[in-house]
Amino acid sequence: QRQMCIRDRLYTSAGGWPFVENSDYYNTHIPRIGGATNSIINISTPRTDYDHQSNIRKDMPMVSHEIGQWCVYPDLKEIDKYTGFLKAKNFEIFKETLIENGLGDMADKFLYASGRLQTLCYKTEIEMALRTSGLGGFQLLDLHDFPGQGTALVGVLNAFWEDKGYVNDEEYSMFCNQTVPLARIPKLILTNNEQLKADIEFSHFGEKPLHNATIVWSIETQKGKLIKAGSFKCNLPIGSGIKVGSIEYPLDTFSAPTQLTLKVGIENSKITNKWNMWVYPAEKKTIKKKPITYELDDKAFEELNQGENVLFLSYGKVAPEKGGSIVVAFTPVFWNTSWNT
């Protein structure tokens, strides 16, 4: 009866877990990548052609709960910003540990490198949601860091809502906006005997549909040299996973390793997005096989004494209490280290 009286509101169960049949929409953690080492971006070759379609309920709108949660290295310069009763003791411990290990001068580089990885993961996760036709929306855990619960540095902004220096609003809004160009690319790492293939889509949740929009695309080198360009005419209704057109381009003219960028946008607007991909020669050069060892035995030292390079893989040799139990994956820590250990 209350719902019938208040028609300008939607009702759902507590966020993240329970499904209640009389909810207006289902807010669930199911359509998100998550922190497992067997997630799509940890076990798959780099690509952008996947979505959450198999997890979408047909009987009720779904909104994904707390997607992202990708952690970044702490910005130790933030310590001085805590001028009141609250002190960043956790950051002070991180700083002491870094200095004790002789890496005190690497703090800013660790922040930037991990921040760029975090940005890539957020781009991947948000675009996966926007490619999913019928998904009602998504909730990020947060745009800024949460300093509690074991230190959850999941934000692209710090705890003071300030820029941390590795991504700006212009780049972030390319893939998180009311209108977002999308591309389903089956391979981001290719050889020059293949074709670059991409199915172009859009997510559009603007005030009204866009009629007769001109969608422009281009392929450029890392230095900005234009390789190929084109356009599509289409209408963009309200929704996600809106199909626009397809691109195919042969790569046989690239004889050396080359980074390419596919850009897609709407003509005469700020709406744009981009994806990097890499092309390598299909013909592999013969190189001398380098020694690989799992133990520093006499044979390994013999190779080293002869001036050879030896790759030492110590997996399974490090004691658990020294870090041997830590599983390594492409993605950064999900939510926080304490939660995952």
Positions of predicted regions on the chain:
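Substrate-binding/catalytic cleft of secreted carbohydrate-active enzymes
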Residues: 1-3, 7-157
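Carbohydrate-binding surfaces of carbohydrate-active enzymes
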Residues: 82-341
